[in-house]
């Protein structure tokens, strides 16, 4: 879950509600912080933690990770927008670390999720519906994808495996701090000329 994601998930809601209609009690939803998403689910088999429609309250992180850990599937929809393309793949990393299979959009996640190996990528609401159906029906596939994703994170994405890269990046930023500050000031003047 996240706040203000209606444009990302709204095109998928008919497929989600159709899965609810087809599978009934086999499905249980844990929604974090997005009350709009929670309200659109046509089932009573759902739980909500944190977040209000106006985004004034955010669920504690431990509620988010507990929900991931208790889930089989994590829905990771992001429309292809400039804002979303600037996001990281952290939700995939968190999902994989807690054993939930990612059903993700290609925006952000296509660079990390290996479709059919460490999760599933969809390119349309129709493909989302097909892949959601597949994940619901196939416990063996969910288990294999979750294990592969967990192994990928353990082998490639832990912080201690990249410390030298992080240190080098921070040293470079520190060395270029005056250049960055000049760029920042130029952007402030451009976007806020009366400031």
List each language-model region with its residue ranges:
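Glycosyltransferase donor-binding loop in the core domain
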Residues: 3-4, 87, 120, 154
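Nucleotide-sugar-dependent
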Residues: 7, 58-68, 72-97, 103-113
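Conserved acidic donor-binding segment of nucleotide-sugar-dependent glycosyltransferases
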Residues: 115-126, 134-140
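Short amphipathic alpha-helix
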Residues: 15, 91-92, 166
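Hydrophobic alpha-helical packing elements
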Residues: 128-131, 141, 145, 158-166
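Conserved catalytic-core segment of nucleotide-activated headgroup transferases in glycan assembly
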Residues: 1-70
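C-terminal amphipathic helix plus adjacent low-complexity
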Residues: 150-156, 160-195
């Amino acid at each position: 879950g996240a706040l203000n994601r209606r444009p990302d998930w709204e095109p998928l809601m008919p497929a989600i509600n159709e899965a609810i209609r087809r599978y009934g009690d086999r499905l249980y939803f844990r929604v974090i912080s997005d009350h709009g998403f929670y309200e659109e689910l046509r089932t009573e088999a759902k739980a909500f933690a944190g977040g209000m429609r106006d985004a004034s309250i955010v669920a504690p992180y431990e509620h988010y990770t507990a929900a991931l850990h208790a889930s089989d599937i994590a829905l990771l929809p992001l429309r292809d927008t400039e804002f979303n393309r600037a996001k990281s793949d952290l939700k995939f990393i968190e999902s994989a670390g807690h054993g939930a299979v990612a059903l993700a959009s290609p925006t952000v996640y296509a660079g990390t999720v290996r479709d059919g190996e460490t999760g599933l990528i969809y390119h349309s609401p129709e493909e989302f519906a097909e892949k959601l159906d597949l994940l619901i029906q196939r416990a063996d596939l969910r288990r294999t994808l979750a294990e592969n994703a967990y192994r990928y994170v353990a082998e490639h994405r832990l912080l201690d495996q990249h410390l030298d890269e992080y240190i080098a990046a921070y040293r470079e930023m520190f060395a270029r701090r005056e250049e960055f500050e000049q760029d920042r000031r130029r952007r402030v003047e451009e976007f806020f000329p009366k400031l």
